[in-house]
UniProtKB/Swiss-Prot annotation:
Chain positions recorded as DNA binding sites: 293, 312, 317
Catalytic activity of the protein: ATP + H2O = ADP + phosphate + H(+)
Main function: The RuvA-RuvB-RuvC complex processes Holliday junction (HJ) DNA during genetic recombination and DNA repair, while the RuvA-RuvB complex plays an important role in the rescue of blocked DNA replication forks via replication fork reversal (RFR). RuvA specifically binds to HJ cruciform DNA, conferring on it an open structure. The RuvB hexamer acts as an ATP-dependent pump, pulling dsDNA into and through the RuvAB complex. RuvB forms 2 homohexamers on either side of HJ DNA bound by 1 or 2 RuvA tetramers; 4 subunits per hexamer contact DNA at a time.
Compartments it resides in: Cytoplasm
Recorded superkingdom: Bacteria
One Gene Ontology term from the biological process aspect of the record: DNA recombination
Family according to the record: Belongs to the RuvB family.
The species this protein was found in: Rhodopseudomonas palustris (strain BisA53)
Protein name listed in UniProt: Holliday junction branch migration complex subunit RuvB
UniProt-annotated stretches for the region Small ATPAse domain (RuvB-S): 184-254
Length: 347
């Protein structure tokens, strides 16, 4: 995983506990994801009118976009109980059975990182989702017997950042799949402004815009940057966060105007200066940066690709003209880098 010191990591950090107060409580307060919100509102209203459990919901998208918040809102809007856990925590079938048998009628069970459920647990989950019953084997050997346990009708809300790792049988049992996308700067401005109001901090429109532009399309990062910029504003006895204070604070935190931090720039600079802009293999980059391959592929690269700084090619990673411009470097001849001795043989 990425080092916890990265302020722009979309993953949850220990200091994000303060972000709970910034979370919207209703769909009406939730900013962004317009189509997803509109559809969810219809499904929730229909289930509430029929007094039925909502169909199982699967949220798919990068970390930090509000999957957990939306799951909590679903339960709140339905007026039912909410239980939360994560895939790695449910180690065996008995753990899942304990959760399911304690649910009341129409309750919401939220499983984060649902792609990390073990196959044995998934097998128990299938009949629970489809028929609202548990099929458990009690005992071992000749004395083993199958026991069916009827469950209350419940709604399973799953969340995953890696939909490709979900098995087809599990994916097919979710009646309401919803993909969350990165937020626009305008949407993040609204989130930052609302967060400032909740925190009791004044903020100008251009101050909110400065934070939003550097938040990498991710509300979790926007909230984290807002809390740190607020510290700078308080230390300076400023009445409100304006563009100048936000720019000073974020520059001090090494988050540049494009939302790139020191690790991003180091990644791009390494390819540009050491490997002629690429192509270079991911294993080579992992060794050069002393970072695990998973951290590079799952955390560092997605935002760089999304912003058009990086291409993944069959021969390796390749910087774009946009990346060289951002670094303030001249773009080298591609022939030299494409056929040079730069180790670009790994995808």
């Amino acid at each position: 995983m990425t080092p916890p010191s990265r302020i722009v990591t979309p993953e949850r950090r220990a200091d994000d506990v303060g972000d709970t107060a910034l979370r919207p409580q209703t769909l009406a307060e939730f900013v962004g994801q317009q189509q997803a919100r509109a559809n969810l509102q219809i499904f929730i209203d229909a289930a509430r009118k029929r007094q039925e459990a909502l169909d199982h919901v699967l949220f798919v998208g990068p970390p930090g976009l509000g999957k957990t918040t939306l799951a909590q809102i679903v339960a709140r809007e339905l007026g039912v109980g909410f239980r939360a856990t994560s895939g790695p925590v449910i180690a065996k079938a008995g753990d899942l059975a304990a959760l399911l048998t304690n649910l009341e009628e129409r309750d919401v069970l939220f499983i984060d990182e649902i792609h990390r459920l073990s196959p044995a647990v998934e097998e128990v989950l299938y009949p629970a989702m489809e028929d609202f019953q548990l099929d458990l084997i009690i005992g071992e050997g000749p004395a083993a017997r199958s026991v069916k346990i009827e469950l209350s009708k419940f709604t399973l809300v799953g969340a995953t950042t890696r939909a490709g790792l979900l098995t087809n049988p599990l994916r097919d049992r979710f009646g309401i799949p919803i993909r969350l996308n990165f937020y626009t700067v305008e949407e993040l401005e609204g989130i930052v402004s609302r967060g400032a109001r909740v925190l009791g901090t004044g903020i100008t429109p251009d101050g909110a815009n400065e934070i939003a532009r550097r938040a990498r399309g991710t509300p979790r990062i926007a909230g984290r940057l807002l809390r740190r910029v607020r510290d700078f504003a308080s230390a300076a006895d400023a009445a409100a966060i304006d563009r100048r204070i936000a720019d000073h604070a974020l520059s001090a935190l090494e988050v540049d105007a494009a939302g790139l931090d020191a690790m991003d720039r180091r990644y791009l600079s390494t390819i540009a200066l050491n490997y002629g802009g690429g192509p270079v293999g991911v294993e080579t980059m992992a060794a050069a940066l002393s970072e695990p391959r998973d951290a590079i592929e799952d955390i560092i690269e997605p935002f760089l690709i999304q912003c058009g700084y990086l291409q993944r090619t069959p021969r390796g990673r390749l910087l774009t003209s946009h990346a060289f411009k951002h670094l303030g470097l001249a773009e080298p001849s591609r022939e030299a880098s494409q056929f040079g001795l730069f180790g670009g043989d790994e995808e």
